[in-house]
């Protein structure tokens, strides 16, 4: 019977095996660039506190030491085998085949969901994100390391959120870290004001106001110049509840948002857009310039003319 605790059996294809220098350098470079590898997180689950001390192994002796540390750890058998499977994927890569990892799959009866998950993490660690997402969104998987996966996909996206959104909408993970939530949310807000707005509503009640204010800030402060008018119009046209509208005005008129460019103008835009003309006219002293092709002084004159005697009613 196959014994995964035997180094000679796991690495029967070459008991003197080791990674070449280029592979070791790539692994170390990616660990630094991504602030940690996903295999590090799996290894830590076995009780090994410092994965970087063992991985990547720089020699055959290093491989034997790593194997011994995994086997003697307190991790579950399927976790230990999954780590060994991950190691074999790297040996498979130069051959263009799956001989080594397949042999371990068959010898240990490693469940398919663990194979799929480890392949996903392996591609993440190689920064092959498109391939990684294909594995990590497999319906057999329960989202694991979702916060970290999403943060990496966003930060390494180069402003293309296709993969991050595909992972989020397909895997439907429950994000738990504030860092991941805000990272993902700010990325959505840069892409679609409306999508970001509905994302705020999907969050716990206690965090909705903070995220709504983030959305307003991103739109007014971080939109490209050629898009700020359109994005501002999209913002003021959102179907806000009474509470959200109160947050909107409080943030832009009295809160931290009052320091943003066009903060008062944006409130005025919403009042006009929602037909609240009397309140719009009550906003004296804005003294603003135009946003896009809109000049608020001219608009005020137009509103007064349109309302006529109703202003005094």
Give the role of each language-model region.
Residues 1-313:
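Extended alpha-helical solenoid/arm regions of large eukaryotic scaffolding proteins
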